Curated annotation (Swiss-Prot):
The lineage of its organism: Viruses, Duplodnaviria, Heunggongvirae, Peploviricota, Herviviricetes. Belongs to the herpesviridae BBRF2 family. InterPro entries: Herpesvirus_BRRF2-like. This is Uncharacterized protein in IE2 5'region.
Length: 332
């Protein structure tokens, strides 16, 4: 089913430039550039043609090859979260919150305390300062400060560079093994705390990886929604952006003769892709993937009972649900 949106404010001689903005996005996949070009074209923030154009851009973003590549990272994100939660529960030896933000903050604090109190050398103090001042999606410091080479740190540095420089990430679920550290990564520490330290450091690295990928996956949709929200607030819609359904009365209303029109797929327009991504990441991986990840932990020397590893979040349906929907979006 198609819906027709009206785009006031575009003269006939501006149509080629209008179309070029979308064809350029289709080639380059740069949402920020497309949003900026639309703002320059309409000039007046109150023009409903700008809002309609942003809704059109949403369909282009949903169905782009770039978005499909990012949707393919969601299963890795889901498994990264499960792995981090499993290690965290192993460290705590009891039921604890599985919230990624709380886990990241707690493990950062604990890691800093271990480095400063159990060793306290200049390298460890420097690492502690870098760790406490670092953001979740920034380039991480090397936590094993006494080792010249850390495979986990090298991997995360590569991922960070791919996100920032290339705007394209190439990873697989096999990479998660690199982020689960061994006791040998902290030879400078007393034997009795090496076991805890490698678990805490693994959690920190896994959380970093999770947030890097999450930002990469969500970034284009967040830019688009922020621009739509700004238009709504500027034009007196005090609640701002809540859903794409609420935009339809604005963008499907004809306000004059000779307005430019554009037909959109109602399924793609009405779905909130960003919310669907977030909903998918509240679920656990299919059981076969959970077993694979728990086997990885056991091979690394962690003893994790399957029941203890389960956070209180629903399991992702294996045949239908969030991810298949996103794959459908990306095939437009």
């Amino acid at each position: 089913m198609e819906i027709t949106v009206y785009i006031p404010g575009i003269e006939e001689n501006q149509r080629p430039h209008f179309d070029e903005i979308f064809s350029t996005f289709a080639k380059r996949g740069n949402v920020r550039e497309a949003v900026s070009s639309l703002h320059k074209l309409f000039k007046k923030q109150k023009n409903t043609g700008l809002l309609a154009s942003l809704v059109i851009l949403k369909q282009f973003v949903d169905t782009s090859r770039k978005s499909q590549e990012r949707f393919n990272l969601l299963e890795i994100l889901q498994q990264t979260k499960f792995l981090a939660q499993s290690i965290y529960k192993h460290i705590k030896s009891q039921e604890h919150s599985c919230d990624m933000e709380d886990m990241f903050s707690d493990c950062k604090d604990r890691m800093s305390l271990i480095l400063s109190e159990s060793c306290g050398c200049l390298n460890c103090i420097t690492t502690t300062k870098q760790l406490m001042n670092s953001l979740c999606d920034a380039r991480p410091p090397k936590l094993s400060s006494h080792k010249k080479v850390c495979q986990a740190h090298n991997f995360l540095t590569t991922v960070h560079n791919q996100v920032v420089v290339a705007d394209r990430v190439s990873v697989s679920v096999l990479s998660l093994s690199d982020l689960v550290l061994d006791m040998g990564d902290f030879p400078e520490l007393p034997k009795d705390i090496q076991l805890e330290t490698r678990g805490v450091a693994s959690c920190v690295y896994l959380c970093w990886f999770y947030y890097m990928l999450l930002k990469h996956v969500q970034n284009d949709f967040e830019i688009l929604e922020a621009s739509i929200n700004n238009w709504l607030l500027t034009n007196g819609y005090s609640q701002g952006f809540t859903s794409y359904d609420n935009l339809l009365p604005i963008v499907t209303t004809k306000r004059g003769s000779g307005e430019l029109t554009y037909n959109l797929d109602s399924f793609q327009v009405l779905q909130n892709t960003l919310q669907t991504v977030r909903n998918f990441l509240t679920t656990q991986p299919p059981r076969r993937e959970q077993k694979h990840l728990l086997t990885l932990l056991k091979e690394k020397g962690y003893y994790v009972e399957p029941k203890e590893s389960m956070c209180k979040t629903p399991q992702c349906p294996e045949e239908e649900g969030g991810l298949p929907f996103l794959k459908k979006l990306g095939t437009g």
